[in-house]
């Protein structure tokens, strides 16, 4: 069994600018850094064995700010990266380019859902019996939850969105 605390990164400059951040590194704002510190405070009593994050800067920095003083192993994986928005990466979110749409060169919902399944396989192979914190991103996190709960892709939208530095406790 794995006890997974799945969280989203802190607020970034790109979140504030309302752009398609996707797989850009991202830079935490002052508020995002405070959110990360608060996450560490909220979870200070949890005896984590390992810390995980996507390999994108905003997720990595969130873990380091929240838990860097614990001196636990911090692993990164591209499996937890946010959706790849393709040619929309770095562009403003507008009515003509909304989060509900995708350009032809973006990662599809099915591809993102499959990547979430690969992340769960990775967890089971490397972290069995552990309590793990994993910091990812809004869209991938919802698909990870769907995979753990056995929900089909069509039902992912039923899973509430993550706010910055929100976490959810899951067991697998």
Which role fits each region the language model picked out?
Residues 12, 140-141:
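Short active-site segment of divalent metal-dependent hydrolases/proteases
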Residues 5, 75-77, 171:
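General small-molecule cofactor/ligand-binding pocket signal
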Residues 53-54, 114, 135-136:
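Short beta-strand scaffold positions
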Residues 66-118:
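Phosphate-handling substructures
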Residues 151-172:
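Domain-level recognition of soluble alpha/beta enzyme cores
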Residues 2, 7, 11-70, 104-107:
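Active-site-proximal alpha-helix that buttresses catalytic centers in soluble enzyme cores
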Residues 4, 130-139:
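Generic beta-sheet signal
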Residues 44-47, 123-130:
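Glycine-rich phosphate-binding loop signature in dinucleotide/nucleotide-binding domains
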């Amino acid at each position: 069994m794995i006890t997974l605390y799945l969280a989203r990164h802190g607020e970034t400059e790109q979140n504030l600018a309302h752009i398609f951040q996707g797989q850009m590194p991202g830079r935490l704002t002052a508020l995002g850094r405070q959110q990360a510190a608060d996450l560490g405070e909220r979870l200070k009593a949890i005896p984590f064995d390992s810390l995980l994050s996507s390999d994108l800067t905003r997720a990595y920095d969130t873990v380091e700010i929240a838990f860097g003083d614990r001196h636990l192993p911090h692993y990164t994986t591209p499996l937890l990266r946010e959706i790849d928005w393709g040619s929309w990466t770095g562009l403003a979110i507008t009515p003509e380019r909304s989060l509900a749409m995708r350009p032809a060169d973006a990662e599809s919902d099915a591809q993102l859902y499959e990547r979430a399944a690969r992340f769960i396989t990775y967890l089971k192979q490397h972290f069995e019996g552990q309590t793990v914190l994993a910091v990812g991103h809004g869209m991938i996190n919802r698909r990870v939850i769907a995979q753990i709960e056995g929900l089909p892709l069509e039902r992912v939208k039923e899973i509430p969105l993550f706010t910055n530095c929100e976490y959810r406790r899951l067991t697998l």
